Amino acid sequence: MVLSKENMLKYSAHLRAYNSACGDHPELKSFDSELQQKTSNLINSFTSDAKTGLVPLPQHAAYKEFTKHLAEVNQQVSDYIIGYGEVVWENSTLRSLVETYFESAKKTLDIAENVTEYVDEAKRGERYIVAAVAQFEKDKENDVGKKTKRYENTLRELKKFEAMGNPFDGDKFTTLFKLMHKEQESLLERVRETKEKLDEELKNIEMEISSRKKWSIISNVLFIGAFVAVAVGSMVLVCTGVGAGVGVAGLLSLPLIAIGWVGVHTILENKIQAREKQEEALKKAHRIANEMDKGMETDKVDMNSISGKVHALKSKITSMLNAVKDATEDGANEVDTKQVMETLTGDVVELTEDIKAVGDDVAKYSKMIEETSYHVLQKITGSGK
């Protein structure tokens, strides 16, 4: 992990410089306060109230919140860079630092937009389920001829869904998280290296105090933007299932304290402590194993449960067909199956709408990132002057 205790040593000097610069420059302090608020909002979006502690969001909802956060921070950084634009265009190293940041934002955008593939899969899966339910209603009324063939059309529709694998698989979102996080980690390293080069230049050249101040502000804004993206990305990965929920504290405490974000750290720590108390109570009640399983459930629908329901339905209908003997039919089992089919329809439609909403929001945030990155890079090349 990039922000491990060992690796944090590489960033310690830059973090101290950032904290010092915040004290020297009110505008940078204002930037920092705004960034802290955005991060606090993100933490709260991943958690319930203080009574229940830290509870992971569904992967698709977490993906939306993380993309929104990246877009907002990107916009915030862009505003500051544009405000000090004339200094950026004068120095090749500072210009390279800005280019590195926004080119990485564009790469992250490309990864984020892959969510559209999952949206399309979810829509196709929804169509198969809706078709299966409609076919079930038709088959149920079909009382002619061989009853052993009665629900074969329904089975055929369910098998189409099964053949897709699992279009609602939350692991697909986690895969995208990992790719985005890896790009953020790479960016942080490149920003650190370029910033160190810039710091050396500042020591060895004569320049006006006002220009030196602007160099310092810009380089610190870019560094902390990249640093926070990695810290937040670590939290998102944990909250979406890569590690236990309480592990977030260990992952984020060090970097949050290092940048002086005591308030943000306190918010996170309170959530973690509430969660730990909750788990301790569950241990005493001998229900901790069940609770840990629930920690990965979505608010209303487990993304993986839909495929499980389809498999169970297919087995149930197959069993019904096998149980038919001449003119005898298991009516009770049929009623039960109908209820499950109706429940499944509601589940899959609701989840598909959620995923479609994520796709719409990600597209909106991606457009924000693309536009701000383009605007800044255009300024750097001189075409936007």
Swiss-Prot record:
TM region(s), chain numbering: 217-237, 242-262
Coiled coil, from the record: 138-214, 267-294
Protein name: UPF0496 protein At3g28290
Recorded family membership: Belongs to the UPF0496 family.
InterPro entries found in the cross-reference section: DUF677 (IPR007749)
A GO-annotated cellular component: membrane
Annotated localization: Membrane
UniProt cross-references to Gene3D superfamilies, sorted A to Z: 1.20.1170.10
Membrane topology summary: Multi-pass membrane protein
Keyword annotations of the record: Coiled coil, Membrane, Transmembrane, Transmembrane helix
Keyword Transmembrane: yes
Tissues in which the UniProt entry reports expression: Widely expressed.
Pfam families: DUF677
Gene source species: Arabidopsis thaliana (Mouse-ear cress)
